Amino acid sequence: MQTHLEALIIKDPDERRQALADVLHAEGLCYTTQSEEPSIKYPRGVVNYLLEPDTDTPSLLFCAHYDAVPGSFGANDNAAAICILIKLAKELKERHIPARFAFFDGEETGNSGSKLYAVNADRDTVTGVINLDLCGYGDTIAIYGKGNEKKTALAPFCGKSFLKKHNGQLVKYLPPSDDTSFSQSGIPALSLAVVPAWDIKFLKALASYGGNLFGHTTPEFDMIVHQMEITSTIHGGHRDAPEWIDSKAMKQVYDYLLEGILKPPAVKSGFSLFKK
């Protein structure tokens, strides 16, 4: 799964963008691009890479951003997640299971790529969204659903026993990512990250502060964020390098996603006053 990690951890944003296109081509994954011209707000423009199923069958959308903050390798944020989704896309294609994939530009500059997609998304064909961000370091899958955990398309990924099997936990806060673009558009979404187990308690503490509501934080909130081990893997932290990416963490997420897709839908039990 780490096969393409080295190819994707490029600091130059234009080369990074082209590297993703090259990897998708090498893997035989046909894609289309969704773009927005350069502007004062987005000087490099926006380029999303989209993988669509062969039919218009309603399906899940799996997404991750491929851009990185200036000067960062962007290994955990977010090349690891890209590698996971590329492998998942290939597997589902071979199994003839319909699914949509989007590799978004501009997450680090205000979610410009996912906003572009969400505004133009056909809600009749996207049943739900699972967004991956920070999936290459840690041992515990953290899932933030903002109340979408019981939505039909997303419920298979949120069951108690299923989460226990994959060492996952539902949390009430994760840092805002591309999932927010879909929440604002009324499309149910989950956001997923992998963190060290001891970081879960910090996420719970951050949730008690109401997250960074409206983009505003307090000194206490920022202090908690900087105490988290996962923070060291992003934005120039001392673990913001490819050698810290853990293949076990990536496989954990991949196995969780694949099994969630393959799970048969839950059968709702009913009660009838009249039995034949």
What does each model-identified segment do?
Residues 45, 69-157, 164-175, 179-181:
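Acidic/histidine-rich catalytic neighborhood of metal-dependent amide-processing enzymes
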Residues 58, 62-70:
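Glycine/charged-rich beta-loop-alpha catalytic/anionic-binding loops adjacent to active sites
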Residues 1-54:
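A non-catalytic alpha/beta surface segment that caps or lines the substrate-entry region
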Residues 201-276:
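His/Asp/Glu-rich mid-to-C-terminal helical/loop segments that flank catalytic regions of hydrolases
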Residues 10-17, 74-78, 246-250:
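Solvent-exposed, acidic/flexible segments
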Residues 60-62, 102, 128-130, 188-192:
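Hydrophobic/aromatic beta-strand patches that form the interior of the parallel beta-sheet core
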Residues 28-38, 186-197:
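Short, well-structured beta-strand/strand-turn elements
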